[in-house]
Amino acid sequence: MEKDSIKVMARNREAYHEYFVEEEMEAGVELVGTEVKSIRQGTLNLKDAWCGIKDGQLILNQMHISPYDHGNRFNVDSRRPRRLLMHKREIMRLLGKVKQDGLTLIPLSVYFKGSRVKVKVGLCKGKKLHDKRQSAAEKDAKRQIERAMKERY
């Protein structure tokens, strides 16, 4: 496997529907036991996951990693909080934006970069109902334009 090859294991598609993604960052994940093997099998879910900053550390909460089939006693709690690895100054900058601007930290995807597990964290702002309707209308209009162009040629 190449050193920087990227293999996406899970995407949080709901996040793009619920939030405007202002900025994206990459962070490493501190995993224990058989969690990496379980992620390689693709048994993880980001649906309800969110990130928070506690005691100067970035924590990933509610990410579900199913127990590894052959892991027996090495398996850990599937929804335990996991520490994300970023530079201290990056975490402090995120803390300032979250506190001041009312933004949220949401995990957007989990992927392998080489042999390391990485998480793409998004600095997001929540969408209101009218924003969601507008996004749906724009997506629908774009589809109709593409359909018309396809029929033309």
PLM feature segments, named:
Residues 85-122, 126-128:
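Beta-rich strand-turn-strand
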Residues 6-103:
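Ribosome large-subunit tunnel/peptidyl-transferase-proximal elements
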Residues 79, 86-91, 125-153:
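C-terminal end-helix/capping segment
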Residues 1-5, 9, 137:
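Intrinsically disordered, low-complexity regulatory segments
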